[in-house]
A protein has these predicted regions:
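A beta-strand edge to alpha-helix "cap/lid" segment located at domain peripheries
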Residues: 56-132
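Short acidic-aromatic low-complexity motifs
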Residues: 5-26
Length: 132
C-alpha cells in the first residue's frame, strides 16, 4: 500500500468536517502552500493553516466533494468539485508528504477561469474575516 494513501485518511476525516485544529499536527513546520490565486509559494505552517482555513470557509463545504484520488509513494492528487454562488468549481489538491505523514507541499489548482475569480473573491473575504 502506498504511504500517501495511508496518510490521506487524516485529511479526509478532519478537513471535510471543518476540524482545522488537526492542521497543527498534519502540516510540516516548513510546509509550502501554493494557492490558485497567489503566484508565489506561501511558506510555513501558520500561513498555510490560515489559507487552508480560509479555503474551508470559501469552498462551500456543503457541496464540496473529492471525486477522484491518485496516490503514489509520498504524493497524492485529489480532484474536487463544488459550487460557490452557483459557479461550478473543479480543481485538484496536489499533496506531497514526508515519511512521517506530514504535508510538506500543498498545491491547489482550479478551473475554469470564472471559478478562479470566484475563489479569489471568497478567499479575500475569508482571510480578512479570519485576520480580524
Amino acid at each position: 500500500m502506498e504511504k500517501a494513501s495511508q496518510f490521506i485518511h487524516a485529511w479526509h476525516e478532519n478537513f471535510l468536517h471543518h476540524n482545522t485544529d488537526f492542521l497543527d499536527t498534519i502540516l510540516h513546520d516548513e510546509v509550502v502552500f501554493f494557492s490558485p490565486v497567489v503566484f508565489k509559494g506561501i511558506h510555513g505552517k501558520s500561513m498555510t493553516k490560515l489559507y487552508l482555513t480560509a479555503a474551508g470557509e470559501s469552498f462551500n463545504m456543503e457541496k464540496f466533494a473529492y471525486v477522484r484520488e491518485v496516490h503514489e509513494g509520498l504524493h497524492s492528487v485529489l480532484e474536487f468539485e463544488t459550487f460557490i454562488d452557483d459557479i461550478a468549481v473543479n480543481g485538484v489538491d496536489i499533496i506531497e508528504w514526508d515519511e512521517t505523514g506530514k504535508i510538506i507541499n500543498f498545491k491547489v489548482m482550479v478551473r475554469p477561469f470564472k471559478a478562479i475569480e470566484k475563489v479569489r473573491e471568497k478567499m479575500i473575504e475569508s482571510l480578512e474575516k479570519i485576520s480580524n
